[in-house]
């Protein structure tokens, strides 16, 4: 264990041996033949608003406690837990009660801290680097101290201050390296947390928490919210099968299953809440109260929709759900030097009839303030058989700007008269498209997709075309086919071959062409913390009929509704002028992105502690007149924003530099 050079103990060899046992304990637990296990869990919590102001209304999941006169709320839940394997726990809520207005969930992001995976690389929901995994020993310093017969104390602290690292201690079983109890502190996503947990007694249960306590504190621009959570796992079944839960807020049933009695202060808060609720219901006949009630309803249904993400399940078995992004939220905006400020709005929904069949839809729209253009993308998918990835999908898109100089060149050859061409805009068009495909995977290695796609391209400046007596819109309709090959199955690289054939006269098409594209993508996880993402591809036109002016590709196009850090930053061109996407009969591209924490800026003394992830980008492209075009970039993500800095070369000469900024504040809330 040469990586443990900084372990401080009286007997260095003994300390190294203890840490070797800790790092290897999870692998020593026999999980072969493990079947899904059912148990139950109980959670109780207390949330207090010590200080608050109007800004709390705009923070996701904080609307309920910001818009009430009560400063302290309590609650409890009783859940069914299905564990298929260590770390894979599915919780289904059976009973709950709380004093939060409207029954809304508050600070659900901190619930992840109640199920730490202490032996995994990532301790909490992919956020915190675990000190108990062998690959992470380079991030921590350890000290082993004797405690009592058969047990030792291991203290750990980070080598540098960073939001993804924690400090604390663990009580370790000396002979096996099993963690009996641990406590750690940290700060992530504006939440300071202190976690104390004990593990199970035997077998696979020793890898999971038996009881976990969390103290959390949220500080943001004058708001101070503290919360205490206690969770007890692996509870036996206490409700008979004949018990049918009609009301999830049934206090009598909660009294049966509750392993921790409520204290006098919690009882007081519940009694106060029920008394206020009953008094409000008794006064609903008063006119003055009706006006006040309608005001509350307006704030509840309109105000929270504007400021909070809306999620809702529906159906007899909650087989349907939808999610609507908040209308007014920092996450709705992004900025890049080329695109300017962009506003985004997203609606998603799904409904599943059974395990194989279902419906999914998404409406994604955006507005570019620089281009003064609305974009939207509306895919709708009907899954026929999810196990075979068999589906029918339609997609309607509009607003994308494309550049085409071939038409202007053709018009200039036809018109020999003296015209001030610089005053005419004959190169910029707006693309409206509709696509319908059927997809089927005969195996995990192969996939086949066939369908049809249509485009209507209209001139942004129709007056210029009217002045020259030319039409200002052009249509194309093309059958399409795509063959997918996955050499290693669904978790490996993906190779695709796309074929598109535009037919003049088909459904009003006035364009004929033939195009082929080949694309390969692979995201290789070097560890749970780091990955290398690669993409390479080419596309070319094998035929272009007379009057077929437009060049457009499926795998090489500008994304007009950019997402955040985890959406589309890797393997995309950030500084490339939009005109180059449609300016060549061929393209060859290659993209690479490497992401890891604690790479460069994370080591800075003060600002480095805020950096969560870092990336290095290299993007290369060859098209007509660009041989080559290369972008070099570096990016990082923090709790508040993600930022990418890029430098471009065109034909080996400097071609500019730029920034891309996305708001990340409260993205995980």
Predicted regions mapped to residue ranges:
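Outer-membrane beta-barrel translocator domains and adjoining extracellular loop/strand segments
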Residues: 224, 375-378, 405-411, 460-467, ...
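C-terminal outer-membrane beta-barrel translocator/porin domains of Gram-negative envelope proteins
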Residues: 391-408, 418-426, 490, 496-600
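Residues that define the transmembrane beta-barrel architecture of outer-membrane proteins
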Residues: 339-343, 372-376, 430-434, 473-479, ...
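Structured extracytoplasmic
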Residues: 4-151, 159-165, 227-334, 425, ...
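Short loop/turn motifs that connect adjacent beta-strands in outer-membrane beta-barrel proteins
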Residues: 305-324, 337, 352-360, 385-392, ...
